[in-house]
Amino acid sequence: MADKQFNVVRRRGTATFPADDTTVVVTTTETNINGLHRWIEWETPNLEGTDSTKIEIRSPSGGTFFDSGTVAESTRFTQGTVFPLPGTVDVVVTVEGTQSAPQDITYDIYFTE
């Protein structure tokens, strides 16, 4: 039996939240992301006035492929699930609460081509 090789690709992105005192939703569009989603990792900083974040991967038409539910702040989170990626997706990150300074949430999407 021949060995199989999988081309695992990592797509790194950042969602930057402005200083704000309301719920903030940041959408980042990722293009040329064709293949099977394998897992997603993201890291949240110590956020002020909130205790959770949420990340979603959506199709351009608004359908949700992936929804993390709420995830604690100040953590690196990994969640795996397999679904097809159609080429262009929106990564939607939601944070609630007051931020006195801009904050970055970084994410890595891993998929096979």
Residue spans for each PLM region:
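Extracellular and analogous surface-interaction loops
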Residues: V26-G35, G80-L85, T112
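Exposed low-complexity, polar/acidic, P/S/T/G-rich flexible segments that act as propeptides
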Residues: P102-E113
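Noncatalytic modules at the cell exterior or secretory-pathway interfaces
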Residues: N34-W42, F83-D104
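Short, surface-exposed beta-strand/strand-loop-strand elements in extracellular ectodomains
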Residues: L47-T64
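Mid-chain, well-packed structural core segment of small domains
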Residues: F66-L85
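Interface-prone segments of viral and bacterial extracellular assemblies
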Residues: M1-K4, T88, T112-E113
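Solvent-exposed, flexible loop/coil segments flanking beta-strands in beta-rich domains
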Residues: M1-T31
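Local beta-strand/beta-hairpin segments that build beta-sheet-rich folds
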Residues: R12, P60-G69
